[in-house]
Amino acid sequence: MKILLKGGRVIDPAQNLDGQMDLLLENGKIAAIAEAVGSVPEDTRLLDLKGMILLPGLVDMHTHLREPGYEYKETIRSGSEAAAVGGFTSIACMPNTLPVNDNRTVTEYILKRAKECDTVHVYPVAAVSRNSEGKILAEFGDLKEAGAIAFSDDGKPVMNSILMRRALEYASSLDRIIISHCEDLNLSAGGLMNEGKISTELGLPGIPTLAEDVMVARDLLLAEFSGAALHIAHVSSAGAVRMIRDAKKRGVRVTAETTPHYFTLTDEAVTNFNTNTKVSPPLRSREDLQAVREGLRDGTLDAIVTDHAPHALTDKEVEFEYAANGISGLETALALSLTLVDDGLLTLSELVRKMSVNPAKILNIPKGTLRPGADADITVLNPGKTWVVDPSNWRSQGKNTPFFGWTLKGKVIMTLVQGRIVYQED
């Protein structure tokens, strides 16, 4: 199959490209990229994309696909289809499944199911510890051999400091990273939302930013001591941003991510007890939100991820205390992130770097570019299209979103994976 994508604005930060160009796709690869591709074979399919923006396929390095074990929340198929709708061509799925992805059998199952679904690239993240209990290290070497791209107990922190040190050193020896969920469970115990004025007014137990900051500080010190690569997940606090910034200046091998809800929402969103605003870490204060936005602007935060955490209605339509944590984010992440461009915080090229180039680089996967010879993984964006968030139309089984009814600007109209159109807007 040969496809000529003609007349669109191509943005590829990996090549410092931003301009109107043609892309020729052949045998699943980028065959040519030029201001005007010359003669093409007769059997080439022509797609006129004038007015559209073509990006290297987005890479989400923090997704929860729920399968195996929680298929009532999401499946690898529904999650992959949601990713394609959102413009993501590669996703890294977290290990908090049932059973936990702490052994090669589960890793191989995920890869097998992803291959059967044949939608987007799926990269399994395996657990740091057996059953993510934080007691005994998982078999990193065996998991890497099976296809694990990184290690994380995400959803839970590794509270044991010596275990975390060993995990960093073990992963480093295998050229893999640890993705750390930074939370001191002793400080967050019993909390339901961010500790502050709003939690006091609502009468809900609070989780202080200190619960995040203490573990960020510990993990940065462990990474500095060991020389290993550390990636800090879903950064939400001003203290965490500040410490990561300082650590980078000292040469610590640390990268960090945040999600759209931490730069678009504050704890004020919880005031009507909407359980779709319950997330871990919790939505923080206005000051924390501003610090996260500044961290994105100055490069302290390397990546924007979805932390896509789909849940069934029964997990959310309960009292706030009993509701599950998480937001379903694959189908809204890009449009929410485009608000950073509209606000002048990032250029479009800088945003693409944080949603494609950098995540691919951090995970060490061959994605995030439209260079000739690369896989033809492409996100086609209509930058001017406005749309209303309505989860009843989503491909994801998880309809849990605090953004219901929001009008957003910028819509993915087509997603290609290895030259195949895996999503096209009706």
Curated annotation (Swiss-Prot):
Q: Where does Zn(2+) 1 bind?
A: H62, H64, D154, D307
Q: Where is the active site?
A: D307
For whether the record's keyword set contains Metal-binding, the answer is yes
> Which domain of life does this protein belong to?
Bacteria
Q: Which cofactor does it need?
A: Zn(2+)
Q: How is the cofactor bound?
A: Binds 2 Zn(2+) ions per subunit.
Q: Which Gene3D superfamilies match?
A: Metal-dependent hydrolases, Urease, subunit C, domain 1
Tell me the GO molecular function terms: allantoinase activity; dihydroorotase activity; zinc ion binding
Q: Which GO terms describe its cellular component?
A: cytoplasm
- Which residues are involved in binding substrate? H64, L65, R66, N96, H311
Q: Which family does it belong to?
A: Belongs to the metallo-dependent hydrolases superfamily. DHOase family. Class I DHOase subfamily.
Q: NCBIfam families this protein is in?
A: pyrC_multi
Task: List the protein's name.
Answer: Dihydroorotase
Species classification:
Bacteria, Pseudomonadati, Thermodesulfobacteriota, Syntrophia, Syntrophales
Instruction: Tell me what gene encodes this.
Output: pyrC
